[in-house]
């Protein structure tokens, strides 16, 4: 199964992506449903930041995920604020992906 992981650009200053990759590789937390499934990570990316919003570059990233055949995109826990509300850009990105036949999972580790 081809999957991708998307994270928050603002959190990138302190995140190496190790916890997301660890959860995927060990098939724990949001990746537990794949415990008997071979996974291919086709992309690991970030949004373009709050200020950029759904700009041409972000749309290009999402289109690329579809072109690469991503069947599922996991949005990292960093795409929600402390209260648990999802970033509006991530919500729009998820909607775009779902409209193009890509399953969206909110969560990684």
Feature locations, PLM:
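Short, surface-exposed linear patches
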Residues: 25-29, 64-68, 95-98
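Conserved mixed alpha/beta catalytic, RNA-binding, or beta-rich assembly cores of soluble enzyme
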Residues: 1-62, 86
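Fold-independent oxyanion-binding glycine-rich loops
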Residues: 8-9, 46-47, 77-78, 107-109
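A structural motif corresponding to the C-terminal end of an alpha-helix
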Residues: 39, 68, 100-102
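Mid-chain, well-packed structural core segment of small domains
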Residues: 54-87
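Short acidic, glycine/proline-enriched helix-loop-strand junctions
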Residues: 31, 44, 82-109
């Amino acid at each position: 199964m081809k999957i991708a992981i998307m994270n928050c650009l603002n959190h990138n200053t302190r995140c190496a992506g190790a916890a997301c990759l660890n959860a995927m590789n060990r098939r724990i937390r949001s990746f537990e449903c794949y415990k008997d499934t071979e996974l291919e990570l086709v992309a690991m990316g970030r949004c373009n930041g709050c200020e950029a919003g759904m700009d041409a570059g972000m749309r290009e990233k999402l289109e690329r995920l579809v072109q690469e055949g991503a069947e599922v995109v996991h949005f990292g826990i960093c795409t929600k604020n402390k209260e648990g509300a999802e970033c509006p850009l991530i919500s729009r990105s998820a909607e775009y992906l779902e409209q193009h036949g890509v399953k969206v999972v909110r969560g990684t580790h």
